[in-house]
Amino acid sequence: MYVKELFVDNFRNLQKQKIEFCEGINIFYGLNAQGKSNLLESIRLLSMGRSFRGSKTTELIKFGEDYFYVKAIICQENNDKKIEFGYKKNENKVIKVNGNKIKSTSELLGQLLTVIFSPEDLNIIKEGPSHRRKYLDSCISVVEKNYLYNLMQYNKILMNRNKLLKSIKEGKSKSILEIFDDQLVEYGAKIIVMRQNYLKNVEINIKKFLLEISNETAEIVYLNSVGLKDASDEEIVKKRLKEKLSKNIDVDLRYFTTQVGPHREDFKIIINGYDSRVYSSQGQQRTAALCLKLSEFEILKKETSEKPVLLLDDVMSELDENRKKYVLERLKGFQTFITHTTKRYLKGDCYFKISNGVVIKE
């Protein structure tokens, strides 16, 4: 799988243009704030249906305009696939695959497989549990077909349960709560099991990568909501989650929120026996984040039997020569997009200069 060409119109600061890419390593260079990251963002948008920077869809429109449109031609097994994403202010976004409009962003997942590496990856390690849950959910959604559906159903039931908790406090009967609990357990257990299985694979990869890069040990600790060391048996997880919800009802009623479930979970990356978020140096944390992203790439490649497209947004300047060489070696043979302020010291198959939103192929 690789991106043959990209067409952008009114996307961020990028000028209206069509760009053709190489199958191998594509280097995009230029001064800061010229549009390098925006180019990668447009490709990632066609892959995941949202900005990797956390921007709202309306913020992707060029200043002074009222719409944007992005289109890519993807080559997959010698067949071309067209993916389009359009959005006009105050209207619904329109996403098409081969000319057919899709109903939801979830249908887009898997059409263009990408892995994004950026300096913000460090936040997965350094920030709070919500960052790690969001990252985990994003990764699993691409390789597990039903994960996003289960997550959406769980969140909808959770929201209704929390509303009910407030109503019970105001005098409504508790009897309906059991119905919500049964539904919450049904979807929650599936989420927990899929997270457990995914993190097992992450641990295998991270152990290998960290040992090869810096000769350090690593493990993943999944802080699941049911208190199990191994939460891979769905029936056991269901039973434990149901027990936890019942036991916690008084606390839930006190705070009007559900205190137990996948929405409160976390995972730790342990380096040399210590929690990397708390005790590791920034250099170690950056290496841990790099290994996490390399693991995402390996799992995606294995589970889909496809070649993901790699997007490296200004990460080369963050890596020393040893880590830079290691990353490029692992990504050899895959279409890769690299942004940097200079093309020096970077070996690519195609070079593009970006200035004021104009992409010029050399």
Curated annotation (Swiss-Prot):
Function recorded in the entry: The RecF protein is involved in DNA metabolism; it is required for DNA replication and normal SOS inducibility. RecF binds preferentially to single-stranded, linear DNA. It also seems to bind ATP.
Disulfide bond sites: none
One Pfam short name: SMC_N
Binding site for ATP: 30-37
The keyword Transit peptide belongs to this UniProt entry's keyword annotation: no
GO cellular component term of the entry, any: cytoplasm
GO biological process, one term: double-strand break repair
InterPro entries reported for this sequence: DNA-binding_RecF (IPR001238), DNA-binding_RecF_CS (IPR018078), P-loop_NTPase (IPR027417), RecF/RecN/SMC_N (IPR003395), RecF_2 (IPR042174)
Compartments where located: Cytoplasm
Family the entry assigns: Belongs to the RecF family.
UniProtKB keywords: ATP-binding, Cytoplasm, DNA damage, DNA repair, DNA replication, DNA-binding, Nucleotide-binding, SOS response
Protein's name according to its UniProt entry: DNA replication and repair protein RecF
HAMAP family: RecF
Main location: cytoplasm
PROSITE patterns: RECF_1 (PS00617), RECF_2 (PS00618)
GO molecular function: ATP binding; single-stranded DNA binding
Keyword Zinc carried by entry: no
